[in-house]
């Protein structure tokens, strides 16, 4: 009780003191895949690139997720069912977490993982949060768009976007990214602190993100914003030690 009183005195007005941490998704979650994850995007197999997700392209071994893109021919239907309905050129992989992430005055979240991300033209891997209902919010913790950069992005609208680029190695070595999401004292906006390899990179803000449920998605999309033509061979995007913790009162 004394500890609670001290923390309550230190808490910002309009927020709750954070005294507990709960593991929402443990770092070894891929070893219990069906407990924590579903295949594909929350809305299905297609999105805004030329990759269509397939179960055979989602591989888990030794607590490491591998999403594999391979060229495909004669896809049916031949174009994506999602806007802008690009032609399908690849079979690939995506997963999403069963648990939604909802930042409130009482609950902050830390979302992290280690990734071996391809950076070749036409490869578009991502590790991101997006709205369960409507859009935005969107927070891109990892997004690689055919260059040796990771993009940290926060979308407040389609035109109000904050992006910070950091160098990303091209040798497919694993590196960590992390986002810490905390409600602001106005109980409307969310502060997002981004890290790479445990080094703080930048703070961005999500306007009106408090109370908005978000999906966590890991996917290997192709072409689209990463350019074209994409690779003629196999592309692999790996993830490990993906973890989500919730801190609350």
Curated annotation (Swiss-Prot):
Give me the reactions it catalyses: The enzyme specifically hydrolyzes beta-1,3-galactan and beta-1,3-galactooligosaccharides
Which residues belong to any copy of the GH16 domain? 34-247
- Result after altering residue 143 to D: Loss of galactan endo-beta-1,3-galactanase activity
Q: How does activity depend on temperature?
A: Optimum temperature is 50 degrees Celsius.
**EC no.?**
3.2.1.181
Concerning SUPFAM superfamilies, the annotation shows: Concanavalin A-like lectins/glucanases
- Can you cite a GO biological process for this protein? carbohydrate metabolic process
Describe the function of this protein. Specifically hydrolyzes beta-1,3-galactan in an endo-fashion. Requires at least 3 contiguous beta-1,3-residues.
Q: Which family does it belong to?
A: Belongs to the glycosyl hydrolase 16 family.
Q: What is this protein called?
A: Galactan endo-beta-1,3-galactanase
User: What organism is listed for this UniProt entry?
Assistant: Flammulina velutipes
């Amino acid at each position: 009780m004394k500890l609670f009183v001290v923390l309550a005195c230190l808490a910002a007005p309009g927020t709750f003191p954070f005294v507990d941490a709960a593991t929402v998704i443990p770092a070894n979650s891929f070893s219990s895949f069906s407990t924590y994850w579903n295949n594909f995007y929350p809305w299905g197999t297609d999105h805004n690139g030329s990759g269509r997700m397939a179960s055979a392209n989602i591989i888990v071994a030794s607590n490491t997720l591998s999403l594999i893109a391979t060229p495909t021919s004669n896809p049916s239907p031949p174009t994506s069912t999602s806007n802008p309905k690009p032609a399908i050129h690849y079979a690939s992989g995506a997963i999403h977490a069963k648990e939604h992430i909802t930042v409130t005055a009482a609950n902050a979240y830390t979302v992290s993982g280690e990734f071996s991300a391809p950076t070749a033209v036409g490869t578009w891997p991502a590790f991101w949060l997006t709205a369960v209902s409507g859009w935005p919010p969107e927070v891109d913790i990892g997004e690689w768009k055919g260059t040796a950069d990771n993009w940290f992005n926060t979308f407040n609208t389609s035109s109000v976007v904050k992006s910070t680029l950091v160098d990303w190695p091209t040798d497919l070595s694993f590196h960590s990214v992390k986002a810490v999401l905390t409600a602001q004292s106005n109980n409307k906006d969310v502060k997002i602190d981004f890290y790479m390899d445990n080094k703080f990179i930048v703070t961005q803000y999500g306007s009106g993100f408090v109370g908005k449920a978000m999906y966590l998605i890991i996917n290997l999309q192709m072409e689209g914003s990463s350019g074209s033509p994409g690779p003629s061979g196999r592309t692999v995007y790996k993830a490990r030690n993906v973890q989500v913790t919730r801190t609350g009162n």
